[in-house]
């Protein structure tokens, strides 16, 4: 009997769960944002080119419907990110963990986002990507360099990952869906 109830609940949630959450995926160019999105969505690595503008995909994960906006990370496109902030419940920040030269730039972009009125209630998932490479900074090192300890008004989580293999992506998404309802 319990099994049939859980099947019924699953079907009910699939068709009648109207909860939909807007998620933006941001990061500097070449961080792996689009690769991350499609590895999560399709569980495969797709050939990518630099994103000009945005990609939009709907993704259902653990009965939670996510509208995922993948935003281009080139300098000129970063100035348009704030146009996507309205009604955003979660931000996924993808960082190239080998890019030591631009840590201060990503820190500046992160804190600019956190200060924006339309993201006041958003949760932040930070993927420390490219952990498969030998010179990758650990999540602990990135946390220190980005001064994550100073984030007081947002729930956040930093997750080591490799978008090419998928390592760490599901753990990060588990954190996101478990916290998105609370935002």
UniProtKB/Swiss-Prot annotation:
Name of the protein in question: ADP-ribosylation factor-like protein 5
Protein family membership: Belongs to the small GTPase superfamily. Arf family.
Keywords linked to the UniProt accession: GTP-binding, Nucleotide-binding
Role noted for this protein: May bind and exchange GTP and GDP.
Example GO biological process: protein localization to Golgi membrane
PANTHER family in alphabetical order: ADP RIBOSYLATION FACTOR-RELATED
Residues where GTP binds: 27-34, 70-74, 129-132
Organism: Dictyostelium discoideum (Social amoeba)
Record-linked SMART domains: ARF (SM00177), SAR (SM00178)
Gene Ontology terms: cellular component: cytoplasm; trans-Golgi network
GO molecular function: GTP binding; GTPase activity
Designated gene of the protein: arl5
């Amino acid at each position: 009997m319990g099994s049939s109830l859980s099947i019924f609940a699953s079907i009910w949630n699939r068709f009648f769960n109207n909860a939909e959450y807007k998620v933006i995926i941001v990061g500097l160019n070449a961080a792996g944002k689009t690769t991350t999105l499609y590895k999560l969505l399709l569980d495969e690595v797709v050939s990518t080119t630099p994103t000009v503008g945005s990609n939009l995909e709907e993704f259902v994960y653990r009965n939670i419907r996510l509208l995922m906006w993948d935003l281009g990370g080139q300098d000129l496109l970063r100035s348009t990110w704030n146009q996507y902030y309205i009604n955003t419940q979660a931000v996924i920040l993808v960082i190239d963990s080998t890019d030591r030269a631009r840590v201060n730039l990503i820190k500046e972009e992160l804190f600019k986002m956190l200060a924006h009125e339309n993201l006041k209630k958003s949760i932040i998932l930070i993927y420390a990507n490219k952990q498969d490479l030998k010179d990758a900074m650990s999540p602990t090192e990135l946390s220190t360099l980005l001064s994550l300890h100073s984030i007081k008004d947002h729930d956040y989580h930093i997750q080591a990952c490799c978008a090419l293999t998928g390592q760490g992506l599901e753990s990060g998404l588990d954190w996101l869906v478990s916290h998105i309802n609370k935002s």
